Amino acid sequence: ITTVDCSDYPKPVCSLEYMPLCGSDNKTYGNKCNFCNAVADSNGTLTLSHFGKC
């Protein structure tokens, strides 16, 4: 199973680095920071579907 460690999040500012991740909501997140902030906002209901665009 594919996982991302989001224990250091949420963070107030994300870099513009582009390394897309596909969330379980079928939305593409630009990088780990954006994805992990969304995970934090979802109270853990959002998970990683796979690396790369959805």
UniProtKB/Swiss-Prot annotation:
Domain Kazal-like residues, every copy: 4-54
GO molecular function: serine-type endopeptidase inhibitor activity
Lineage: Eukaryota, Metazoa, Chordata, Craniata, Vertebrata
Locations listed in the record: Secreted
InterPro entries referenced in this protein's UniProt entry, alphabetically: Kazal-type_SerProtInhib, Kazal_dom, Kazal_dom_sf, Prot_inh_Kazal-m
Domain notes: Avian ovomucoid consists of three homologous, tandem Kazal family inhibitory domains.
UniProt GO cellular component terms: extracellular region
Domain of life: Eukaryota
Cysteine disulfide links: C6-C36, C14-C33, C22-C54
Keywords assigned by UniProt, alphabetized: Disulfide bond, Glycoprotein, Protease inhibitor, Repeat, Secreted, Serine protease inhibitor
Sugar attachment sites: N43
Pfam families to which the protein is assigned, alphabetical: Kazal_1 (PF00050)
Repeat keyword on record: yes
This protein's name: Ovomucoid
Major location (coarse): secreted
UniProt site positions, description: Reactive bond 3: L16, E17
